[in-house]
Every structure is written in structure tokens, then in C-alpha cells.
Amino acid sequence: PLAFAQIKVGMVTDAGTIDDKSFNQGTWEGIQKAGKDLGVKTKYLKPTGTTEADYVKEISNLNDAGFKFIVTPGFKFETAIFAAQDKYSDAKFVLIDGSPNNGAFDSTRQEKVGPNTVSIFFAEHESGFLAGVAAALQIKTGDFGFIGGMEIPPVQKFNWGFQQGVAYANKNLGTKITIKDENVIYQGTFSDVAAGQQLAAQMFDKGVKVIFCAAGGVGVGAINEAKARAAKGVWIVGVDVDQYSQGEYAAKKSIILTSAMKRIDVAAYDMIKAEKAGKFPGGQTLTFNAKNDGVGIPAVDPNLSADTAKKT
């Protein structure tokens, strides 16, 4: 392990802020918990842009400042870590939701999880499934929708899992929920808040009762639209973290029905803990799933009845 008297854990954020109620925040919360529990020093840097060069620059800045255990959240860091793991071979890297590669999509493509890197993925379909079952049980009849960000595997897995969960509830638990093709939309970005609000408005206007958003900032727009219509009984299923507080529109009232969570915080924390114990799984690709508490729905979901909570 890195000499732990001096271990310093650094994080580079993606385009979002550290309190984005999503990937950056989840990662940082895990790192901060490690700071508290394990006595490691922590720091994050926000790049000025979103190119590989911008990311590598901040990785370099962390490394130069002695922050040699570096955690990066999201697939956008894949090429930066591919370069950095060789360049800074005495540092350790944790890439969440991605695997290091050179960014090529032809015969020149190279992929490598270096001996000083761990690549972490999540079984999104499992938490999507649980959220689908819970939402169907709670609402019982009507139309559901899905808004995704970019059409990439983690987002697709959330969508497919959610649809499977709803189908399971329809078949086995007496619910009658439909998800029409026209109400399954990938917006194409994770940042267009206005587009998210517009898409949600269109779906709600068509009578959709619940929208599952796996779309970062686009989902923030959908949440805002649902808040404006809270009196009409519309809901959002949150993603990545428990988004209940983000959906609050009045004291103790939220339009977040449940959330399909990826315990990004647990992943970051577990890797730092492994490093401290001299068991950093360098060179490996790990999957966090329902079995190892890596995904799931919140333990406390105020908008789900006791009966729904029991069945899920």
C-alpha cells in the first residue's frame, strides 16, 4: 500500500459540481467518509474544461501535490486514466463506471486496466428492476416513462431493468402499468436541464404518472417540472443517489417516488479501505451489485407504503 502515514486521496470532478446530487457528490461523500474513518487526507480539483487534456492536467496537479490515490467518477475519464496510469505508475487510480482505453473505436483501440488501477462497474439493471417493481406496486395503474441522458450501457441498463421490473409486477403482483415506446427517450446529453424539463412536461401532458430519469442534469429539469405539477400527483424515480431531498417542494413532501441507486460512495470508500489494508485490487475490474450492497433502492422511502416496501 501507499505509505499510509502520508496517504492522500484526490478526486477530479467531471463537468458537474461537487454537490451535483449525483456522481461527483456520491464519490466525494465516500472519500470524505474515508477521511473521517481512516484518517486519510482528501482533496478534489475541478477541471476548467472537459477534454482529456483538462482531466490529465488535474490528475497531474494532484499527483504533484502528493495526492497519489486518485478517484475519478464516470466514463468520461477513460482515456485520461489510460494515459495517467502509465505516466504516474507510482500512483493508484480508481475509475468508477469506466474502463481505461485510448478512445479509438477501430482496430487501433487499446484497453488496459493497469496494475495500479481498479475499474468499477455497477449492476444498474438490478437497481432499475427494484425501482420498477416498487413504482408499479405503489401506483398500480397508468403510464410510466423513461428519460435517459446519453444512450450508453449504464443508462440503457437502468432503462431495461426498470422496464423488466414493471413487467414483473404486472405479471406477478397484479399491477397494470404500461410503458409506451414514445415515452422512452434518450435526450443525448447529461447537462441540458431545459430539455429535461420540456421532455417531462410533454410526458406529463400525455398522462404519464411516473418518469424514471437516468440523465444527470437533464433529470434535474424533469424533477423541476414534476415539482411544479406536484398537486397533480406526478412522480419521478431518481437515479444514482437517493434523490428524495432534491424532489422536496414543501415540508416533508417530495415528488421522488424512489431512487435506483448506485452506491458510488461505497465503491470509493471500499477501495480506499482496501488500500489501507494492503489489499488494493490493482488490475481488476469489479462489479458492485445488489448482493454486495452496491446497488438498490433507499432503505427508507417515505413515498412508498409499508406494503410496497415489504414486497420489494
Predicted regions and their residues:
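A residue-level marker of the well-folded mature domains of exported/periplasmic proteins
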Residues: 5-312
